[in-house]
Amino acid sequence: MGRQEEIIQKDMQSYLPVFSRYPMVLDHGNGAYVWDVNGRKYLDALGGIAVNVLGHNNPDLVSAVAEQAARLIHVSNLYYTEAQAEASDKLSRLTRDGKVFFGNSGAEANEGAIKAARKYAHTFAPNKSQIITARNSFHGRTLATLTATGQKKFHKGFEPLPTGFDYVDFNDAAALESLMSDET
């Protein structure tokens, strides 16, 4: 058994298989390319599944991360930091002086959007709590974002799911319009 197979077998012993994985063990990257433990080179066209598209081993990014890690790696939002104040100021200006909340994942961002929509509805339009999402979408692994995900295979085993979600096919404006009501 080769090194790649050994690593995969070891991983399968302890990692919860909540999604399918490619049978390759990545070792390092440079720019848009990654190499597996066997030295095979691949074009990284996945971009961290929309988490980042920064490439690998960029000297400026590596330097900035190392500089920040030498100061603070992570602190709670219970504290102020200059970096957060500057980042939120820049983002706020780009969004016409809106407010910014930093989260850790897409699921957290989507969960926050669902909560913001529900809070707005609760405050200003109590009957408008229904949310429409697309079939074959994926919004995350929290219970609400899992429910918002328009794929029944992800719902199985997690019932009862939160209520208030409808689903429509992508690019079907008529179906979307038919789902819109006094509750959306």
Predicted regions and their residues:
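Active-site-adjacent loop/helix segments that line or gate small-molecule/cofactor pockets in enzymes
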Residues: M1-N30
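Active-site and channel-lining beta-strand-loop segments
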Residues: P23-D44
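PLP-dependent aspartate aminotransferase-fold enzymes
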Residues: D89-T184
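Short beta-strand-to-turn element immediately C-terminal to the catalytic PLP-Schiff-base lysine
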Residues: W35-D36, L54-H56, T147-A148
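Generic secondary-structure signature for well-ordered alpha-helical cores
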Residues: M12-S20, P59, A66-H74, R93, ...
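Short secondary-structure boundary/capping elements
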Residues: L26, N57, A83, V168-N171
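Glycine-rich loop-to-alpha-helix module at the N-terminal edge of alpha/beta enzyme cores
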Residues: K41-P126, Q130
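Hydrophobic side chains within well-formed alpha-helices
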Residues: Q4-I7, L61, A87, F154
